[in-house]
């Protein structure tokens, strides 16, 4: 894996060599004049996506699902998380199946009085209900973008946090069971989706000495080719200041063309449960694709494979999140 580099600003003391009659002394910047620079590596995030796809679909109860859980928790531990919690539980799906699910919570700077949350879902759709073929509509999808991309970005964020510890707390939360919902009637079947975050809402452990996050950002389908992210409707309704903060950071980071400052779709996603837990939450998601006027064309199809992933999209989202983390902590990371 090309794990990328953390580049640190530094100053070098120079000895002035010259004649004794030199009247002006060169003024050199001190160490304090330089800022640490945290680089999010899009190639590294891409390799995390590729690793997930290689495991096969990550449908709850499958071999790929079990392998991915080990991969996620092992990566968080390798990247120095203060704590890694596997929140195992069961939930009944709309199919009548009882699913064994696991949310994963990795905490960085866990003792900090302030924190933010960045989340994604790590499961994949059990069937390609938007696929063109009958077989595809009844078999699990690869889930490179829908499932894999958010995880890839978050795991690369974890690597950055290991090498440049944040001044604020950062909770990285991967939800299970997001994509097991009934698609026949979106508005009436909201409760069949986002099973992991629904459970987490009542079992998140915030309270007592643990600080509740100031806000949360959920990343979903953030790796599509040429992806552009519009302001999701419910995010603007419940947490418009957070949307402003993220979109402003994207613009100042050079990704204003990727984060479009206009309204997108109204999406059922894990941010809804987080908002109901009393934490202002938004979702970054491609919801106005230029070809479909909706989600990415590969959504819930077997074309959602590694060829659908764009390193530039991963980089834009990941670097924006990294810059946001250090800006919140007063560390002023730059690209």
Segments (PLM) and residue ranges:
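Sec-dependent signal peptide recognition
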Residues: 2-9
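C-terminal motif of bacterial Sec signal peptides marking the signal peptidase cleavage site
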Residues: 14-16
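N-terminal capping segment at the start of a domain
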Residues: 22-69, 79, 293-308
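Second-shell loop/turn segments in exported
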Residues: 31-39, 53-63, 91-93, 137-147, ...
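A non-catalytic alpha/beta surface segment that caps or lines the substrate-entry region
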Residues: 51-111
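Solvent-exposed loop/turn segments at secondary-structure junctions
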Residues: 58-60, 90-93, 110-112, 122-126, ...
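Acidic/histidine-rich catalytic neighborhood of metal-dependent amide-processing enzymes
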Residues: 138-241, 266, 271
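Active-site-adjacent substrate-binding region
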Residues: 215, 222-335
């Amino acid at each position: 894996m090309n794990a990328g580099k953390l580049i640190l600003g530094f100053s070098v003391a120079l000895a002035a060599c010259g004649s004794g009659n030199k009247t002006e002394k060169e003024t050199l910047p001190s160490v304090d004049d330089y800022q640490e620079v945290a680089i999010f590596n899009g190639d590294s995030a891409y390799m995390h996506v590729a690793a997930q796809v290689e495991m096969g679909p990550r449908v709850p109860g499958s071999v790929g699902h079990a392998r991915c859980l080990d991969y996620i928790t092992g990566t968080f531990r390798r990247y120095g998380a203060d704590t890694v919690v596997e929140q195992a539980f069961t939930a009944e799906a709309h199919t009548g199946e009882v699913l064994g699910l696991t949310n994963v919570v990795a905490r960085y700077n866990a003792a900090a009085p302030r924190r933010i949350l960045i989340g994604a879902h790590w499961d994949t759709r059990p069937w390609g209900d938007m696929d063109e073929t009958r077989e595809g509509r009844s078999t699990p999808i690869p889930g490179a973008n829908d499932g894999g991309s958010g995880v890839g970005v978050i795991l690369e964020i974890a690597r950055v946090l290991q090498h440049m510890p944040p001044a604020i707390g950062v909770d990285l939360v991967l939800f299970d069971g997001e994509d097991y919902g009934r698609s026949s009637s979106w508005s009436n079947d909201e409760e069949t989706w986002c099973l992991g975050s629904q459970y987490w809402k009542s079992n998140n452990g915030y309270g007592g000495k643990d600080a509740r996050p100031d806000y949360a950002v959920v990343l979903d389908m953030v790796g599509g080719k040429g992806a552009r992210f519009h302001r999701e409707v419910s995010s603007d309704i419940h947490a418009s200041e957070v949307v402003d903060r993220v979109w402003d950071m994207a613009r100042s980071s050079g990704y204003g063309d990727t984060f479009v400052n206009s309204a997108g779709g109204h999406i059922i996603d894990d941010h809804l449960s987080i908002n109901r837990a009393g934490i202002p939450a938004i979702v970054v998601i491609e919801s106005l694709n230029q070809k479909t006027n909706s989600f990415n064309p590969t959504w819930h199809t077997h074309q959602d494979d590694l060829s659908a992933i764009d390193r530039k999209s991963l980089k834009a989202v990941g670097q924006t999140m990294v810059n946001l983390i250090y800006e919140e902590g007063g560390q002023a990371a730059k690209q």
